[in-house]
């Protein structure tokens, strides 16, 4: 295979050869704008530029991420990202020992996923931080893993004679190796030996999996329906985007044609709007299913087959409606799938207050859902995808993270034992490494990826965490912006354009669905037609120093629990403040799960008072009025249950 690396910076002659460029990115205004900037900034590494552009832009995308290094968060999320980066990716993560699974074999199924997940999150975090210490760590572990390449080109935990090791999860493990290496190659170092290893890994899969006499993909995997193996679709499509080798596109079509799992076709089911918990023939494993649909989005981006856009949009809508809880994650054990330990779709949106639930909301589910929402947002500009990301990151994602930054909870309850390390994984001399410990940092890395994005007509603001950002105008000129805010502690934000040449272009703001009466002004002049749950596009001649002021409608809302299979769910209510879910904390309140009657107005809202938190590390705490006096509630994410205390998010009513 010959790679064309000639790049003329500032033109569309980035020369991504072959099918991927022809089908995906050609003659796209959005591609042109970002590729021009990225190529100019990275002209010393044309291979990496080509890989970045190939994977990042498609003519079908409505939005694109800003170029790496173009956004810097400050405050709320930045502290958490740095905490995790310092204490996990640059801290306790045992890179050498998880790489040894490929050298010495594994003691249980799927352990080979660990290396791929570690490098995937690290590479995505490097995309944001350009941290030199992190780069050195990643370079060392990639160099190490390349010494494990087997004679058929595979990086696998089992010898060639035992591949594909179906019940051992060999294909799933190799999927994660490919995801890690494509991400590393794109954002960290586009070394030729890495590209060679990616191609070798992919080609070894193509040699083994396919139509008879090869092994059938849906017969691979540890689960009885093999759904996890079809998630190889995403990295194979990424490699197609990088290389243009049509064999990878053909293989991806084969994966889709096989339906995603045994005894069901999850793509047909999504097209038919089958509820997610009824998909996949009795094993609707949520994390793995999300991973497969991430690959389907990539396939659509390159082929433009509208059928598949309808398919993933149906899946997206049905997950929103049927599975996502108030903290932005989903999946549970009761009532449908107790044997899957809280890791399956379970009609969770309706069942979330069911007192019989013992395990729910695996962190892997939440992160894969967030990633899928990001893909949907990029491809369709569906503003609800950003709403659901916001819901998850402020509540479920941060709520799963250990206070010390050195890991994430496996599953996450709304009432009772909020967090646990109990689940699939391996203990390294007292350090529990689980799938969720490894996936959590990837979720953090996707926050800056989508916080501010680029349309063909100007920047798009999706999140209101304070930031500095560099984007492009409609004429492809640089514009620099600063968002000043204490959100969500405050309901006010101010966006200032700090550097630009005067020009007419569009600046687009997401108006959150929870903010029913948002006020927006430009240089003091009120803006009309501001609608909750929509994008607000401000098209005008912008000048340096222009300011956009935003006031959110941060009413505190009391919501009744949805009622699913268990009528006892009707006995609970929850409290939301803007995007933040509040909870009672046994660490500070011995009566944390006692029934209360909230004092609300006719619209179900109430006046709460911010107070100084009783515990260090609590982000937000409020006095909340009840019929028997005020109680304290804090944000769900801050409730620390790692030392055995409990949480109450669905509050029992006074009967």
Model-identified regions with their sequence ranges:
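Well-ordered alpha-helical scaffold segments within catalytic/enzyme domains
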Residues: 69-71, 75-77, 117-132, 176-191, ...
